[in-house]
């Protein structure tokens, strides 16, 4: 028996990194999982490699109507949605005095606006189901998990845009928890510290991605900063994506039915930003 047997989940940004590890873990615990990524080919490949029932919905979630299409795709594929993890995102770093409006807005769009829109798209499905269950004397929990960061809770030099956006999703989480608790919808967030993904790889390696607007963005952080980050983590190293996915599974499972409106810090003991 798996912790998520019979459940259907959406994990955004689930073709790589923490999202991919989360999708794999959910599937291993019995959930059906909708795989989402900006790159359709990468999403299809991930879905094919995950051992379990999956569906794919690729595309730019920042586009108008995309969140509604995402939820509709999951309902069409699985009949219902029980768990949603708002994980999709990327970084576009720069010091504040050189940051463009486009850079700043792009982070707000993917890290704050998209989770809000996904939640709004879920509302008619989850609220109406909960009302019917309440009338029947049933208590059924559904799970909304937003991914934040210590950049959002503590701030981080060179990431004023990302920090603002990840702080914003904390506000979204806490407000939805107050509004939706009556419907037995657990709303929580995970604030990660340093996790080894392509976003935190050495910048010297030359990693890059193309933003939804077509902009080429350098990924990673300088090797010197990576060394400093490891030095201030009491556990002595960054997390792996697999380690990061465990707390997300906890929040998605019945073990966390009475955990609500919380920001779970998963940092290896690091309480500040990655560097100051």
Give, region by region, the residue ranges found by the protein language model:
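Active-site helix of classical SDR
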Residues: 119, 165, 173
């Amino acid at each position: 028996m798996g912790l998520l047997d019979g459940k259907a989940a959406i994990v955004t940004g689930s073709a790589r990194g923490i999202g991919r590890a989360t999708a794999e873990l959910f599937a291993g615990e019995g959930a059906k999982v909708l795989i989402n990524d900006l790159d359709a080919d990468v999403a299809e490949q991930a879905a094919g490699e995950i051992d379990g029932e999956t569906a794919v919905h690729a595309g730019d979630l920042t586009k108008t109507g995309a969140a509604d299409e995402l939820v509709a795709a999951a309902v069409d594929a699985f009949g219902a949605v029980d768990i949603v993890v708002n994980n999709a995102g990327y970084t576009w770093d720069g010091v504040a005095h050189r940051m463009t409006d486009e850079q700043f807005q792009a982070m707000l769009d993917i890290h704050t606006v998209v989770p809000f829109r996904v939640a709004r798209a879920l509302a008619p499905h989850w609220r109406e189901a909960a009302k019917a269950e309440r009338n029947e004397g049933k208590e059924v929990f559904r799970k909304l998990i937003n991914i934040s960061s210590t950049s959002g809770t503590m701030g981080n030099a060179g990431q004023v845009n990302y920090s603002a956006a990840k702080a914003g999703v904390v506000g979204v989480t806490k407000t939805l928890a107050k509004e939706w608790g009556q419907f037995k919808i657990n709303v929580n967030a995970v604030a990660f510290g340093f996790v080894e993904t392509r976003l935190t790889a050495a910048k010297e390696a030359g990693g890059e991605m193309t933003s939804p607007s077509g902009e080429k963005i350098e990924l990673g952080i300088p090797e010197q900063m990576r060394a400093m980050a490891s030095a201030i983590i009491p556990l002595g190293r960054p997390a792996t994506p697999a380690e990061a996915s465990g707390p997300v599974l906890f929040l998605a499972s019945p073990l966390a039915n009475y955990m609500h409106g919380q920001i779970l810090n998963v940092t290896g003991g690091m309480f500040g930003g990655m560097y100051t």
